[in-house]
Amino acid sequence: MGRYASGDLVLAPVRIGGGGERKVRPVVVIRGGERGSLLVCPVSSTPSSDGVSIPISLEDFASGGLDLFAESYVLAAHSATIQPADVAGKKGSLLPGTLAAIREAMTRLQRQAGHPP
């Protein structure tokens, strides 16, 4: 089990949209949670049709990155909670400004849904 920080891009099994099988995909660590859990947002090669998608490219990484030939998208509306033991590997870390944009999008979504940030 590793230690992961906000802004880390890791590989972990997540479900997008709540249905179907979990699939190992890149996810951005938004923050650590209770009992060591991690709040993450999945990354996809296509933007979400039902929520906010934040584009990321190689220029958004402080270190490492994805094998990107085109933009990828952080799916802010599909956050999930995982355990550090679920992480299959670390791919890199996002720049602080990129992480801030993702958090801002998540806060807007929570306010629209009537939940406090």
Enumerate the predicted regions with their spans.
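C-terminal terminal-subdomain/extension
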Residues: S63-P117
